[in-house]
Amino acid sequence: MTKTITVAHIQYDFKAVLEENDENDDEFYINVDKNLNEIKEHKIVVLGNSRGVDAGKGNTFEKVGSHLYKARLDGHDFLFNTIIRDGSKMLKRADYTAVDTAKLQMRRFILGTTEGDIKVLDSNFNLQREIDQAHVSEITKLKFFPSGEALISSSQDMQLKIWSVKDGSNPRTLIGHRATVTDIAIIDRGRNVLSASLDGTIRLWECGTGTTIHTFNRKENPHDGVNSIALFVGTDRQLHEISTSKKNNLEFGTYGKYVIAGHVSGVITVHNVFSKEQTIQLPSKFTCSCNSLTVDGNNANYIYAGYENGMLAQWDLRSPECPVGEFLINEGTPINNVYFAAGALFVSSGFDTSIKLDIISDPESERPAIEFETPTFLVSNDDEVSQFCYVSDDESNGEVLEVGKNNFCALYNLSNP
């Protein structure tokens, strides 16, 4: 049964309204999407002389954390998480399409743009290095290598490039794809990487030589474009099923690794990176493109996939016939990105919606389940989010960085109230 995640948007500067401390009443709005064609506006009145707020009959609005607010409107609960650091104030204007982070001696961020540029930033979003025209068209993905001293980029120009963070040099370009390269996964220390493309292939590369070791395709349709991939280590059951295969001498760390792919057709495939076999195929349940997918970091049997029609599906790879959970976000509006981190799922939908959904343990089945009844909305000025990036913190639940169009680059704290 499909469940609907009700979407709400709060006035971007509502915190300023709350903190004005005026003698007179003021107000801000929360818009709740009832359906595609109907939006209900709730006016939250901030009473003068610090007398609290009036959210209307039967409704409430309160602060529950340093950057977290809760509204109960017409029986529905909504959480709103506000920005703790606005990186756009430090950056030259651009549309951001890719992000990653690494921390060795110091925290760094990398951002990719629609113009093909790469920006390397320090922990305060100060520009350390800019690689202009790293690609001739939009950058689709950026990944730091585990050393933190090199990164790899992919682009609509059909190429992948390896870069030195220290001096911006490009020691290797990986050429072979015949359409946009959509995604990257790094295996272990980075001698091997995987790349996905709209040409229907997933390529396994050896970075030292730039050699393609193997090309994966969907067996039933080799030209079915790949929008998104995720790498994971097989479960005990999956590892038991690995067939013996002679490893190429250019492969490092591929044993036990699987890559899952979301296709333009909506089909999802799983490939054993070591044996080179396609092991699972999930059907195109919603007859539209699977735009993005991610693996549950706490249980690799479960994956989450976002589709062109606004559906979010949870799949159990042990039961591939149909999803174990179906959720509708902004019906008819594409899901741009799904990302698992810190026990939660982050979802970008359409031009203006960014949601955090906690993953909980279902009390009956004990499987991971999406807690959809109280979504957390990451507050922005109706900005379209391209990608998410988790920033770990030993002292809390960490932070998440969002990047997107119109110079959007914002950091949110994930600590619980």
Curated annotation (Swiss-Prot):
State its role: Acts as a regulatory subunit of the 26 proteasome which is involved in the ATP-dependent degradation of ubiquitinated proteins. Is not a genuine component of the 26S proteasome, but an auxiliary factor that interacts with the proteasomal ATPase of 19S regulatory particle (RP). Acts as a chaperone which regulates the highly structured assembly of the 19S regulatory particle. Involved in the substrate specificity of the 26S proteasome and is especially involved in the degradation of ubiquitinated GCN4. May contribute to the stability of the 26S proteasome in some stress conditions.
Q: How does it assemble?
A: Associates with the 19S proteasome regulatory particle (RP). Interacts directly with RPT5 and RPT6.
Listed A to Z, the keywords are:
Chaperone, Cytoplasm, Nucleus, Proteasome, Repeat, WD repeat
Q: Which domain of life is it from?
A: Eukaryota
Q: What is this protein called?
A: 26S proteasome regulatory subunit RPN14
In this chain the WD repeats are located at 134-173, 176-215, 242-281, 285-325, 330-371, 380-416
Q: What else does UniProt say about it?
A: Present with 2210 molecules/cell in log phase SD medium.
Gene name for this UniProt entry:
RPN14
- Origin organism lineage: Eukaryota, Fungi, Dikarya, Ascomycota, Saccharomycotina
Supply the InterPro entries for this chain: WD40/YVTN_repeat-like_dom_sf, WD40_repeat_dom_sf, WD40_rpt, WD_repeat_multifunction
Origin species: Saccharomyces cerevisiae (strain ATCC 204508 / S288c)
Cytoplasm: present as a keyword of the record? Answer: yes
- GO-annotated molecular function: protein folding chaperone
SUPFAM superfamilies noted in UniProt: WD40 repeat-like (SSF50978)
Keyword match Chaperone = yes
Q: Name one Pfam family in it.
A: WD40
**Subcellular localization, per the record?**
Cytoplasm; Nucleus
What family classification does the UniProt entry report for this protein? Belongs to the WD repeat PAAF1/RPN14 family.
